[in-house]
Amino acid sequence: GVYLYLQALKKGDSRAERILRLISSNGGNRSGMAFGAVDSFGNVHPDQFTQSVTFGNVNESSFGEIWTNPHNELLQALKERKKYLKGRCAACRWLDLCNGNFRARAAALGDLWQSDPACYLSDEEIK
């Protein structure tokens, strides 16, 4: 993503602009937005890595009902995550391209909305 673009740009690689166009086209991490995961018990999660968050169960409601439930505050927040993100992510100039990256890693440290602890960009690169 952004790291590859910045490295290509630093090296004067002619593919830098193509990389930027490609990463600009998808809007970054889309967990809980454009895709989710259903585990073997029928539980619906934002992705296959965030098993600690469950939105419902397909044995009780259809996936469509679960995924579009306007009363599920966490699911709705994930779909509008940019206004909830904290720390480095909230201030990052690349937020539109990575979308806060991987929420499961932040959740593993206790706060789904905190910065991704494995962000590969330096403080200088996010400003």
Where is each model-derived feature located?
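Short cysteine/histidine-rich metal-coordination sites, predominantly Zn2+-binding motifs
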Residues: 105-118
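Active-site-proximal, Lys/Arg-enriched surface segment
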Residues: 21-22
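Short, acidic, Ser/Thr-enriched surface-loop or helix-capping motifs
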Residues: 38-39
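Short Fe-S-cluster ligation motifs
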Residues: 77-81, 115-127
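C-terminal accessory region of radical SAM enzymes
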Residues: 1-18, 43-93, 99, 104
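Short, small/polar residue-rich loop motifs at catalytic or cofactor-binding pockets
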Residues: 29-32
